[in-house]
Amino acid sequence: ENPQFLDIKSYIEKISSKQFPHHIFTYNRNNNANEQRASQIKFEHLKIDHIQKQNRGNELAKLALNLAKSNKERHQAIQDFMLINDSTTIAAEVPIYLTNWDAGYYRNQKGFIFPLNNHQTPITGHIDLMQVRNGLIHILDYKPEADKIKPIEQLTIYAMALSRKLNLQ
C-alpha cells in the first residue's frame, strides 16, 4: 500500500458504510434537485484554454464503446471496461459532495472566490472514473458532447470536493 493514497482508500471504503451521508444523494425532482447537482451548476471562472490530448485512456474508451449495444449503455460500458482493463483506474461512480463549510474553507483559508458559498444544500455528484497515474489523482467524466456542454464547473466542483474529503493541500 502506498501511504500517499490511504485517504482515497479510506474515503472509498466509507462510501458503503452507514457513516457516509447517502441521504444527500437522493434527489427530489419537485424540490429544485438541479440546484444541488454539480452537473447543473454554472458559474464565472477564469478563461480556460481547452487542450485536447490523446493517451491510452482515450484508446481504451474507444475500445469500450464497441461493447455498448446502444447509446444508453455507453457510460456503463466505459466504466466497466476501464475498471477491468486499466490498472490506473481505481473506482467508478464515486459519490462526492461539496458543503457550505467546504466553500467557506476555500474562501477563508485559500482566498478562492466563487458563487457557491451560500448554497442551500450540499452540491453533489458522482465521479465517473477515478484514476491514480504518476502519483496524481485524475477525475474523469464521460461526456460525449463535452464541446457543447462545457463541463469545467462540474469537474472543478468535483476536484474541490474530493480535495476537502481527502484533506489534500
Cite the ranges covered by each PLM segment:
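Catalytic cores of nuclease domains that cleave nucleic-acid phosphodiester backbones
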Residues: L46-I137, K165-Q169
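Short beta-strand-loop-alpha-helix junction that forms the active-site gateway
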Residues: Y142-I149
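Metal-dependent nuclease catalytic cores in nucleic-acid-processing enzymes
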Residues: K150-Q169
